[in-house]
């Protein structure tokens, strides 16, 4: 069983079409039997159409789990709950983002945004910093596909006191590398109080290969996925969240080049890691996250002098696993039973007040926000490989805010939370709009029956 990356072109469509439905149909027409998309992004859009990158699971008919879920399943929220202000912060993995494109370097942004939210829902790429994780206290650590499903309205999230975390690792040919991972689990037990549901070694291990797409984004390929899925399936009752640590094969010499690049090379590991965890969380409805294992102890102990600050967490870490264990420790439970969505302790799409993304990023979360009328704040300063004009998406007027930086984003978040029009605190201030309605002509049209009037069944019966 494979996880592969596919690039497809989808022609542009006329205005008024629901984009989620359009993309679902266009993608389905280009997939082979047994292929299921687990990850979707539009890397470039123009007058000719949309260049899309898909993470594809092959041989899905051999999966050990039951009914599969389409990543395009959508449920419109009927109301927005306004008793709390909850925001979602996303920095897509593997796109070379200025903030969040390396090792947890978007954590200060997450902590900043969390300061004006009741809850900040974010994902591993934002806060994972190898052996460091300083996510905000009111942050919810959620795998990327789970955020998509939350915004699509098909799942809810429930806070937990703690999770039983299963750790699945490669049975590494270098015994010391495996021992580092086991020690990391023990360290989490005695510092966090983590309930480790055990460490399972897989032999032969699942093969992960890091690659780059034509857009320059980090993607990859996974082989032997069925071995990992089988372990998770057989032990499903033993854990609440699953951490995976395994080698990621990269091009020869890239490891050294990456650390010496001054942050100019896109982190090669994240893309294939996201493909893997999207599959796990989608198939089993469990929180999941991945940490790369070193190729050998020489790599684990490699020294590169003073590196770019955004890469420094990797330079001071040898195991890269603690961030994952800390995140999964209290990652929220995934609720799929819609009968429970009205429970006061279940967070759903109705509870999301805003989505914050780098400018130009279009994937399921952005498209879902458009359909759910969730305000979106797009940050220009967080430059990345995506080439999309968000202004061309069918946002309801006043639901898209393009800002220069995350400091400005906090201002917009505060305005939304306070119920203050953003335009009211900007200058120049536009003139108040005044229009006229010719009521005599309107009433005449009613009298002549040119404008239909809704009549209740009771009133119709009286007539």
What are the language-model segments listed below?
Residues 133-135, 256, 301-304, 389-391:
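Short secondary-structure transition/capping segments
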Residues 136-145, 305-323, 393-405:
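Acidic, Ser/Thr-rich peripheral helices and adjacent loops at domain boundaries
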Residues 295-299, 319-352, 358-463:
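C-terminal functional extensions of proteins
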């Amino acid at each position: 069983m494979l996880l592969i990356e596919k690039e497809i072109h989808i022609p542009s469509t006329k205005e008024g079409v629901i984009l989620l439905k359009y993309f679902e149909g266009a993608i389905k027409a280009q997939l082979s039997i047994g292929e299921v998309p687990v990850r979707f992004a539009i890397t470039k859009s123009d007058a000719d159409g949309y260049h899309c990158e898909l993470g594809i699971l092959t041989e899905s008919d051999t999966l050990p789990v039951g009914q599969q879920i389409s990543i395009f399943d959508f449920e419109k929220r009927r109301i927005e709950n306004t008793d709390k202000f909850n925001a979602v912060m996303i920095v897509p993995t593997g796109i070379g983002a200025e903030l969040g494109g390396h090792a947890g370097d978007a954590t200060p942004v997450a902590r900043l945004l969390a300061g004006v939210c009741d809850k900040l829902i974010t994902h591993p790429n934002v806060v994972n910093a190898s052996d460091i994780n300083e996510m905000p206290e009111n942050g919810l650590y959620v795998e990327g596909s789970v955020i998509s499903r939350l915004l699509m309205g098909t799942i809810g999230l429930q806070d937990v006191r703690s999770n039983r975390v299963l750790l699945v690792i490669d049975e590494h040919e270098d015994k010391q590398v495996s021992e580092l991972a086991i020690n990391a689990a023990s360290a989490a037990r005695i510092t966090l109080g983590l309930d480790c549901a055990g460490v399972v070694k897989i032999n032969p291990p699942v093969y992960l290969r890091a690659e780059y797409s034509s857009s320059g984004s980090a993607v990859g390929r996974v082989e032997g996925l069925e071995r990992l899925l089988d372990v998770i399936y057989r032990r499903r009752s033993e854990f609440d969240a699953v951490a995976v640590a395994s080698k990621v094969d990269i091009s020869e010499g890239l490891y050294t080049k990456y650390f010496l690049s001054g942050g100019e090379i896109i982190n090669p590991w994240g893309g294939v890691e996201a493909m893997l965890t999207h599959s796990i969380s989608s198939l089993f409805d469990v929180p999941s996250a991945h940490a790369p294992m070193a190729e050998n102890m020489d790599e684990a102990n490699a020294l590169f002098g003073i590196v770019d600050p955004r890469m420094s967490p990797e330079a001071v870490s040898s195991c890269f696993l603690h961030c994952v264990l800390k995140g999964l420790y209290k990652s929220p439970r995934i609720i799929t039973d819609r009968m429970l969505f009205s429970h006061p302790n279940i967070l759903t799409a109705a509870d999301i007040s805003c989505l914050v993304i780098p400018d130009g990023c279009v994937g399921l979360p952005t498209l879902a926000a458009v359909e759910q009328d969730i305000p979106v704040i797009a940050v220009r300063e967080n430059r990345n490989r995506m080439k999309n004009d968000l202004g061309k998406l069918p946002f309801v007027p006043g639901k898209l805010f393009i800002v220069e930086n995350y400091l400005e984003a906090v201002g917009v978040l505060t305005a939304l939370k306070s119920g203050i029009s953003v335009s009211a605190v900007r200058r120049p201030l536009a003139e108040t709009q005044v229009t006229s309605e010719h009521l005599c002509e309107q009433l005449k049209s009613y009298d002549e029956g040119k404008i239909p009037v809704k009549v209740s069944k009771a009133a119709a019966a009286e007539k």
